[in-house]
Design a protein with these regions (language model features):
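Terminal transmembrane helical module of multi-pass membrane proteins
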Residues: 126-206
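Membrane-embedded alpha-helical segments of small multi-pass membrane proteins
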Residues: 42-46, 50, 71-74, 110, ...
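Selected alpha-helical membrane-embedding segments in polytopic membrane proteins
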Residues: 25-107
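N-terminal juxtamembrane cytosolic/stromal segments of multi-pass membrane proteins
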Residues: 1-30
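Membrane-helix interface and helix-disruption motif detector
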Residues: 53-62, 108-118, 165-178
């Protein structure tokens, strides 16, 4: 009976140690992926806004959004080569979560859904979940705030439909406004979160 209790205690201690080890390692390396995807997304969003403002036929340039996964994955490959670490079950679960979110975000444009708020909700869920694992309350709140901020898009569309006629605020102008809102939210969600995580990493080192 005592041996069984010891085995249970050892198992619990092993699980706790694994979680703490994952938390420490993830906190060490977590900020940079947020910055990579954040800056890439914001840069592409700004480019899209500029193209919409300057080009008459902007629809062919919508394929430019796929620069986000291409550039993001290339930069992540470079980052992972430099930061070779041993992973455990917790790490693999978080990686699987973000891979699933990435695949879902990639498929969304082909499904005819409202892409901007849907992507923000997905990234917000991933951010809040990851922050919960590493016990970062600020980043967790940012993730939840981003999820709720996705409601801005239908609200803005409703507001603009009341203030302007369809001719005054056609697809081009509405898309331009939504690109800007998307860029701002993604900057706050990913770039600010990445900066916070990197700042805490530097504090732990010192």
């Amino acid at each position: 009976m005592e041996e069984k209790r010891m085995n249970e205690a050892e198992s619990l201690e092993l699980i706790t140690s694994m979680i703490n080890d994952s938390r420490a390692r993830m906190t060490k390396n977590l900020g940079t992926p947020f910055l990579i995807w954040g800056y890439t997304t914001v840069a592409v969003s700004i480019c899209q806004a500029v193209i919409v403002a300057c080009v008459e036929e902007f629809y062919p340039y919508l394929w430019g959004w796929f620069a986000i996964p291409v550039v993001g994955w290339l930069l992540m490959l470079l980052f992972n080569k430099q930061e070779k670490t041993v992973t455990n079950y917790i790490d693999r679960c978080i990686n699987a979560l973000w891979c699933a979110i990435g695949v879902a975000a990639f498929i969304l444009p082909f499904m005819g859904v409202f892409v901007f708020p849907s992507v923000i909700m997905l990234i917000g869920v991933g951010t809040a979940t990851t922050a919960a694992v590493v016990k970062d309350k600020i980043v967790k709140r940012i993730g939840y705030a981003a999820i709720f901020s996705s409601l801005l898009f239908p609200f803005v569309r409703l507001l603009l439909s009341r203030l302007f006629t369809l001719e005054q605020f056609a697809g081009r102008e509405r898309y331009l406004v939504e690109c800007i809102i998307f860029a701002v939210i993604m900057f706050l969600l990913l770039v600010v979160s990445g900066r916070i995580l990197n700042y805490k990493k530097r504090c732990l080192k010192s």
